[in-house]
Amino acid sequence: MAQTTALREEFVPFQSRIAISAADAACAMLQSLAGSGVLTYYFTRWRGLDPDLAAIVWILFGIWNAVNDPLFGYISDRTRSGLGRRIPYIRFGAPIYALAFIACWVNWPAPSQAVLFVEMLLALFLFDSLYTAIATSIYVMPFEMAVSNKARSTIFVWKIIFSVFPLAVPLVLIPIIQPGPGEDATGYQWTMVAFGIGMAAIIFLSTFFYKEKHYQQAEQQLPFLKALKECFTNRPFIIFEVLSFTIIYVQTGLMQGVLYYFDEINVPALPLYIALAVGIVGGLVLFINRRETWGVKKSMRIMTLLFSLGCFAVLLFGRHMLPTMLGMFCFGIGFSGGMYLVPLMNGDVVDMDEQRTGLRREGMYAGVNSFITKPAISAAQAVFLWFLARFGYDTTLAKGLQSASAETGILVGWTLVPGLLLFLCFVVLHWYPLAGPEWERIKARLSVVHAEKERAYLESKGYRYVE
C-alpha cells in the first residue's frame, strides 16, 4: 500500500516575519537619509556645494538609478549559493552598506566646488548600488519565504507597520539635529555613524531568522523583448506609471523641502507634525474601511485630489500656521494612501497582465516600474534646487536669514510641481479601466485560477492548501 504524506498548512514563524520587516525598515531608513533631501541639504547648506552643481549630480545619478534595479534583478535571479539567491547579498552586503552610508557624511579636506561635486556623485553611486543589491533582495524575500498568499500576507502586515519609522525620522528628527552653515556638525555626523552601524546590524542579524525555500519558477516566461512589449501594451500599466512616478516624486520632494521650510519659515513645527500624524493615521483608517465600497480607483482619485489641495494650501498660505496645518493633514492622507493604495493598484495591473498573457510577471513589472520611477527621485531633487537658485537662495547664510524671495522659492519648489502632478493624476485616473462589475468578474475568475494553481503547487511540496 502506498504511504500517504500528511499535508500541513504553510506557516511563516513570527520571528521570521519580524526579522524581514525590521531589515526592510532598516534598509529604507538609510536610503531615506542618504538618498533623499537630507544628503542634499548637508552638501549644499553645510559643506557649501552650489545648488546648481548638486542638481547636476542628481541628474547624472538618475541615469544610473534608472537601470541598476533591473540589472541587479537579472544578476540576483541567476545567483546560486548554499544560502540561496537573496540572503548572501543581504547578509554580506550590510557591513559595506554601512560604510558607504557613513562615508556620505565625512567632511573630507580641501572642499572646492569640483571636489564636493565629485564627492557627492561618488557617494550616491556607491551607496545606491549597495542599496539596490540589498533592498531588491529584501523586497522579494517574502516570495522566497512563502508560496501561499495567506502566508505571505502575514509578512506584509508587519512590513507596513515597520515602514512608519523610515518615513518619520527624516521628517521629525533630522530638522531638529541638522547643522546650518558655520555650525558644529560633529554631533550630527556621529548620529549618522550610529544610524549606519545600527541599521546595518539589524539587516545583518535578520538573515539568521529567515531562509529561502528555493522554489523553482513554475511557468515558462516570455522572452525579454516580448515581455517588455507586453508591459507597455497593458494600458492600465501606463496610467499606473503616471501615478507611481508622481508618488515617488512627491514623497521625495516633500521630505526634502521640509528641511528647508523649518529653517526659514517662522511656523511652529509641533502642530504641523501633529497634523501630519493625524492625517497619516486617519487616511489609513479611511482607506482600509472604505476600499471595498469605493474601490481602488475612486479611493486613489480622492487621495490624489486631497494631496494636491494640501500642496496648494501650503504654496499659497505656507507662512501661516492654520492653513499649513490643513496642508500637512492632507500630506498625511497622501502618504498613507501611497503606502496602502499603490501596492493594491499595482496588483490589479499585474492581474490584468495575467488575464492578457496567462502568466504571472510581478518581477518584470517591478523592473520596468523602477526603470520609469527611479528618475523621479533625481528629478524632485534637481527641480527643488533649481527653484531655490532662481529665487536667490543663499547657501552661505545661517538659518533664518534668507530673503523673502528665497522663502517664496522654498514654498514654490516644495509644493508647486507636486501639486500639479497630483492633480494631473486625479484627472488621468478617470480613464483607469480596472474598476466596476466587469473587472470584479475578471478578478473572481483569476482568484479561482490562482487557488487551483496554488493548491497543486503546495500539495506537490507537502503543504495543505487553506482557504
PLM ranges: what are they?
Residues A2-E467:
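Membrane-embedded alpha-helical bundles of multi-pass transporters/translocases
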